[in-house]
Amino acid sequence: MSNNNNEQLRTALGAQVGQYENERAWQQQCYAENEAKISRLQEAKQAIQQSKENVEACADVWKTISLNFEADQDWEGAHKNDILNCMSTAVETDYNTYISNIDAVLDAICDEITRLENENWKTMGIIGHLSALINSLWNENSKLFN
């Protein structure tokens, strides 16, 4: 009987080991998939940040043109006032709205990167959970400076 119990125990333990190995392989696959997604998101984030810098540069140029046009003393009248109003309100407002929308996209990308990183951290036990909390706080801080 002892051999039969030992054999059953070995079979049960072998099944558990197989189950743990499958779980580990699945977690490693999820981890690798998340890392690939994070890499693509970081590339997109860099491209969008570069676009934002370009738009901000265009907005600065537009503001300079608007100020120079406003300072021009050779042209006066209602048409000049209409054009100045359009330049200073409509166009500048549109630039600011566009930049704010880019910021919202960057924040969303940062949130998704953090979510994926935290998923990976949480596979590492209690230290991973603590690291995920710190990572979330760091993300909120980083978004303030977008």
Residue ranges and their predicted role:
Residues 1-43, 96, 103-104:
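Short, charge-rich amphipathic alpha-helices with coiled-coil/heptad character
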Residues 1, 73, 84-88, 142-146:
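Long amphipathic all-alpha helical oligomerization modules
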Residues 38-72, 76:
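Extended alpha-helical coiled-coil "stalk/arm" regions
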